Amino acid sequence: MDNRSPRSRGNMGPKPTPLKVRGDSHKIIKKPPLAPPHPQPQPPQTHQQEPSQSRPPPGPVNIYTVTPRIIHTHPNNFMTLVQRLTGQTSTSTTSSSSSSSTSEPKDTSTMVDTSHGLISPAARFAVTEKANISNELGTFVGGEGTMDQYYHHHHQEQPHQNRGFERPSFHHAGILSPGPYSLPSVSPDFFSTIGPTDPQEGTPYLIPSGDMHSYLSQDEDRGIPHSVKDTRSIGSAYDRYLQSMQTFFVPSEEAGPFNGVGMVRQGGSNMMPGPSMGELMAGCGGSLPSDFRPNGRDMGFGQLDSVGRPGREPHPLPPDVSNTLYVEGLPSNCSRREVSHIFRPFVGYREVRLVTQDSKHRSGDPTVLCFVDFENSACAATALSALQDYRMDEDEPDSKILRLQFFRNPGPRPGQRGGRR
């Protein structure tokens, strides 16, 4: 019975021929390590060798470095200070310096015991510098303002010793903190008054009167510019926008009533909103300036006061003036919504009413009658002055131009017997 697995049976076959291995391949050849080259023995140097052939002495090794600093001291203490820094001491020098300390300021660097070389020269340098600075200040305590007192004090005591002694600089100047003596002096008129110190005194500002004419006005009594006060009764965002714009008086024979009041584009094109009508109305009743002719056109330039109104007494509007505007010149295909977009930004706007009438001619376009209602006559006058000669489409040369006037009940037409039924 064959106990071999089926897998082993499938692998059965003719045995391969045995490999022929040469006997040399079993040998492992290990090369010996390379021996270092033997140095050639040099002949012994004789004492008769010339000194020029000897090696140069090695350079000095810097164990530490000290940043160069400037130490201010008296000439009599210079030798003592050098000996303290270099580590050399002398009892005779110490005694001579102590005897001369009665007539000159005492140097605390002599009190530092560094004669035995127990500390490094760098540490000795730092201790000595700190002691000298504290001693030089002495009783002259008070910061940067007292440096001059110390300087003049030493010049008065020893003028013969300090002739070649420069003025000490106790503060090392830098980029962010320059010394007090390196800064130029400030002229008295360098700073100017920005505002009044006392509100009641009213010190004048240093602002030219013509620089900010749109925001400041000149007081006639004291010549003090101040903010423009909004005293108008029609106070709204749109009215303030109108007041901020500059007023141009452009009289034109082709313009309708109240031309020249608002802001007119050059070349007789659309009439942009201007601040004048909102500013010329004193109260809700409204008024017109005396510069206007009976037909509503401007006669010239009027002098404005601090709030932009003419300096002359304005004429009030007629008492029976209507708060409804009659608008002519609308296209025949315009809608009520389009007309409302024109008048909605104005203060006091209520509604727009359109009446369409058929043309008398068969091929003619229908006529559109437009009536715009406002809260009062002053609001209606503001819109009238702003939209007079308004062009509906600037790109079209034959575009319609709006003609606005106050609406009134028309009387009997010529040739009619009675009134309108």
Swiss-Prot record:
Tissue specificity comment: Isoform 1: Expressed in root meristems, lateral root primordia, root vascular tissues and cotyledon vascular tissues. Isoform 2: Expressed in root meristems, lateral root primordia and root vascular tissues.
Induction / repression: Up-regulated by auxin treatment.
Subcellular compartments: Nucleus speckle
Highest taxon of source: Eukaryota
Biased composition (Low complexity): 89-103
Domain RRM: 323-409
Disrupted-gene phenotype: No visible phenotype. Nsra and nsrb double mutants are less sensitive to auxin.
Pfam families, A to Z: RRM_1, VQ
Cellular component per GO, a single term: nuclear speck
Biased composition (Pro residues): 33-44
Nucleus recorded as keyword: yes
Gene3D superfamilies: 3.30.70.330
Function comment: Alternative splicing (AS) regulator that binds to specific mRNAs and modulates auxin effects on the transcriptome. Displaced from its targets upon binding to AS competitor long non-coding RNA (ASCO-RNA).
Name of the protein in its database record: Nuclear speckle RNA-binding protein B
Organism: Arabidopsis thaliana (Mouse-ear cress)
